[in-house]
Amino acid sequence: MQRRTFIKSISAMMATSTTLGCVSNSLATEKHVSITDFGLRPNSGDDAIPALQKALAYCKKHPGTSLIFPLGRYDFWSTKADRDFYYISNNDDGIKPVAFPLTEFKNLIIDGQGSRFVFHGGMVPVIVRESSGITLKNFSVDWDVPFHCEGIVEAVNKKESYVDLKIKDGFSYKVENGRFIFVGEGFENPVIKNLLEFDTKRQKQAYMARDNFQREIQPVTTEIRPGVLRLQGKYPTWPKVGNTLLLMQERRDWPAFSVQDTKNTWLENIDIHHSGAMGVIAQLADGIKLDNVNIHPKDGSGRTVSTTVDATHFINCKGHVVLKDCLFQGQIDDGTNVHGMYARVAEIHDSNTITFELVHYQQLGIDIFKPGSKVNFSDSVLNVFHDNVVDKTVRQDAKYWTVSFKEPLDTALKVDDVLDNMTWQPDHVMISGCRFTGNRARGALLTVSGKIIVENNYFSTPMMAIKIGSGGLKWYESGPVESVEIRNNIFDNCNYAKDSSAIDIVPGRKSKATTPYHQNVKIYQNEFRVYNERVLTTSRTQGISFVSNKIVKTSEYPERKSAFAPIHVERSSNFVYQGNDFIGFGHSELLFIDGQLVSGSGKLEGEG
């Protein structure tokens, strides 16, 4: 197996010469080394970084080594960690201290043997870059002081527009000049991005609680007594006394794992209890598997939040992407995203050459087009009208690249059209035996052309459980899908924070186009437990089947009337609907096909 990372480690290089002399020759032949051989003991409270730098320098010189951490707690401080500038897609770029900078490693196993890795200050635990055959297993990741803040609502005064909040133990902050400031080990952040209400008993986003984005206008904050804050400002939905209010900071600086330009990366038996960004972010990874990777607050911590944004995210990866027996709980965004990245045509130079732009500021610097890559070009409504092969690329800066193609470009090409790398797409995406619950936003966002299988999972998410979209004007996430099977899953009262369907298959750019975008989606033998009656919404999809599913009406949340039918189909063809069992609905108007409600028993077949 292989794994790889992305850092140019200056301090590790400096440590190499002294390290190798400290390790006996017998260790080099055994291919197993212990972190204790480099002077670090578990539960010592010492900074693990100096010993780890020596150990990694040794492992880099000896491909095929297993680095063992005997069971215990290990502490990592940012002050002595290797630093480099990183572009990490969908996160914030910048100079980042990294505990495990695995750049240009081969066939390395890091085995924590059940240990707890605790990090201090702003840092990234692991970056795997330009490496192959990397396995990371058997440890947990956490921070002593988290990057966000949580409190229990003590009082709500709508007339004077404030909420009183008792801050939970274990969170650090200060108030200066009427402003709340996040305080961590070695960092401060004065900007609240979002105030979000969670149901304390359910440990889920509160029913129909909306995002309360702050950013430009921060709440006026007063500490009315020790540990109790009064937050005065606007609230689109008012929290309830006794519920939990999350104070989320704006930055995405500190993901737990970043995987970049790698081949065959495995994460096994890992708990990610917290991070100051995503849990696992992979870009341009050729083969990546997460097996029993559990993202959730540590038991007994009193925390509601695990990762401060998505649990996992995979961008322009190829080969296989596998999520097996994972838990995604408490992340303040989606459980997983698997997609490509559209680039915008910024300038057309001649018949073979363009300059493209990476649009979103958190996608800059990612070299998504390489010589030999097959590229599709799409118009404003995402119809593919041309394909070509990259001949050469010239990077202008982090935002713009000039690209020459092997064949003449289509004369219909214009500025603002988009291009997508079809070479860097997964052949196979498997999500099996996973649990998505207790988060903000969606479960799985899937928009790649390879074979996608979603089976034997449990979804209980505040928005869509499965979103097949792409093409939005903000993130420029590419698609479409060509082969999806969604089978034997449980969808348990999703959409309790937004009126939407459990499964939503709609392109991200709104248009009146009737041409197919997605194709070949099979949804069968699933159980949908729904309080709001909404099950499936699809548009511009060719070849969709909804077969042998069980749909049960529940009273888990207050019923909400919707303008959408349980099965809502627009501008789609080859629609197959049969053998479905609706329980507790009390009416037969279950289908909406291109403007017409259709009554049926669940055994209708036809084309929309």
Curated annotation (Swiss-Prot):
Coiled coil: none annotated. It is found in: Cell membrane. The keyword Aminoacyl-tRNA synthetase does not apply. GO terms for molecular function: alpha-galactosidase activity. Its main location: membrane. Residues 1-21 form the signal peptide. It is a lipid-anchor. Belongs to the glycosyl hydrolase 110 family. A subfamily. Alpha-galactosidase that specifically removes branched alpha-1,3-linked galactose residues present in blood group B antigens. Has no activity toward linear alpha-1,3-linked galactose residues. This is Alpha-1,3-galactosidase A.
